[in-house]
Amino acid sequence: MSQFPSSAIFTVSRLNQTVRQLLEMEMGQIWLSGEISNLSQPSSGHWYFTLKDERAQVRCAMFRTSNRRVTFRPQNGQQVLIRATITLYEPRGDYQLLAESMQPAGDGLLQQQFEQLKQKLAAEGLFDQQFKQVLPSPAKQVGVITSASGAALHDILQVLQRRDPSLPVIVYPTSVQGADAPLQIVRAIELANQREECDVLIVGRGGGSLEDLWSFNDERVARAIFASRIPIVSAVGHETDVTIADFVGDLRAPTPSAAAELVSRNQLELLRQIQSQRQRLEMAMDYYLAQRNREFTRLHHRLQQQHPQLRLARQQAQLVKLRQRLDDAMQQQLRQTLRRSERLQQRLMQQQPQTRIHRAQQRLQQLSYQMQSAVERQLNQNKQKLGIACSRLEGVSPLATLARGYNVTTAPDGKVLKNVTQITPGETLKTRLQDGWVESQVTTLVPNPSSVKKRRKPSSQS
């Protein structure tokens, strides 16, 4: 078996480290476009995702310090363009990219620019409803700003011819796609305002991709539409297409054909309206005549009611009613006076001195009885409390202890004696018994042997 020099043998760690250094030094930073998949955004703030195309994929990471500068929220399936460094994660030997910047690619970039311009113009108030102009009804002359060769112009003219052939139309031809298109659209709007030939404008084109419709997302076009003194109907693309011009315009039409219907009158509808107005006029006339007939009948009846004989009869009936009301009022007043007199008499009877004295005597007797009962209850409670206190006092009295055969001996200075060490032979002591005092003189002291042993100290060893 042949021997290899030790320097030619790699460990796994050394191999991964060498490959990482080669990738980072040789490749450096690169730009890479692809579709995002497996996007993960954990609580750490870092992003982990895969970039793929139809044939391959590569793992990517974007740390929090880098992704905080990204101006949009990435989504799975979104095409993006990233600037990244190629590296290798040594512990697992995984090859990956460390992204430092990210931006949308293709339509994604256009969509981001669309949202940014939309927010800017909305903040300036260009979309506010208060600035929207009302379309004339009916329009006297319509202006169309679109491509002269596009299908949108053909659709608009066809609808106008069908609905209102007598409506004049002025076309302001312009490019609707390409780098020069926004400026041409702006000039066409300004020209229409200078000539003042039309009282409403249709600005639009047929359908297409987001990039095809981009001229109508241009800020210059938006500001020209906002500044127009002539009301503008925005008609760009299909119903699902939305542009900045739709937000700024005075009215949005889903298609160019729909815009033509909005600014024109339908002849058949006009005929139906005329017929309807005629029917309403006839009905109004019939109603008016019927009202006048009813008014005549009412006045004739009132004239008959104003005959002098009828008026006299009504006044006599009214006089009878008034007389009856007067009698009723006098009877009511008399009854009220009688009831008031009875109430005053009852109150006078209640206020007589004898009645008040009798009630006061009854109240005094009741209070006297209550006071006597309260005093007796209080005396009984105090007697019970005194008896309990005396019993407790006798239980702790020294005299009670003496009655059981005990006595208390005191020294000449009055101090109570507890042991023989406090006594000196020859002293005169006082002993308190239950029924008196005894004075005695000490001749002999006889200590308790057990107490002497307790007080004796142990002898030291020689």
From Swiss-Prot:
Q: Name one GO cellular component term.
A: exodeoxyribonuclease VII complex
Its localization reads: Cytoplasm
EC number(s) of the enzyme? 3.1.11.6
Q: Which InterPro entries match?
A: Exonuc_VII_L (IPR003753), Exonuc_VII_lsu_C (IPR020579), OB-fold_nuc-bd_dom (IPR025824)
**Primary location class:** cytoplasm
Please indicate if the UniProt record lists Metal-binding as a keyword.
no
Q: Which reaction does it catalyse?
A: Exonucleolytic cleavage in either 5'- to 3'- or 3'- to 5'-direction to yield nucleoside 5'-phosphates
- A GO term, aspect molecular function: nucleic acid binding
Stored Pfam families? Exonuc_VII_L, tRNA_anti_2
GO biological process terms, alphabetically, are: DNA catabolic process
Record's keyword terms, sorted: Cytoplasm, Exonuclease, Hydrolase, Nuclease
Assembly behavior? Heterooligomer composed of large and small subunits.
Q: Which family does it belong to?
A: Belongs to the XseA family.
**Protein task:** Bidirectionally degrades single-stranded DNA into large acid-insoluble oligonucleotides, which are then degraded further into small acid-soluble oligonucleotides.
Q: Which HAMAP family match?
A: Exonuc_7_L (MF_00378)
The entry's protein name is Exodeoxyribonuclease 7 large subunit
UniProt organism field: Pectobacterium carotovorum subsp. carotovorum (strain PC1)
